[in-house]
Amino acid sequence: MDISRAEQRILHHLAQGGRIEIKREGKTIAEIRCFTRDGWVYPGVDLELFRKLKRKRAIRSSSGRPYRITERGLYLVRSELDNR
């Protein structure tokens, strides 16, 4: 299954230890933020992209914690060199 460039970027951040946090107002999602492993906010996540990743089962949350990458997400993301 192919994933878009934006999905690949987000999954790569999550694979390196990042997380996606959501804030709700009632039952609706008010805000979505993607944090890198260093604590910086990555601006490339919107509601549509978040729902695509959930639909593909690439991310998951358990017990109300932030969303993390799943094994399926690791399979979908192509490896990239980390220039650190």
UniProtKB/Swiss-Prot annotation:
HAMAP family on file: UPF0386
Family: Belongs to the UPF0386 family.
Entry-linked NCBIfam families: PRK13687.1 (NF010240)
UniProt name for this protein: UPF0386 protein NGR_c10980
Disulfide links within the chain: none
Superkingdom, taxonomy of origin: Bacteria
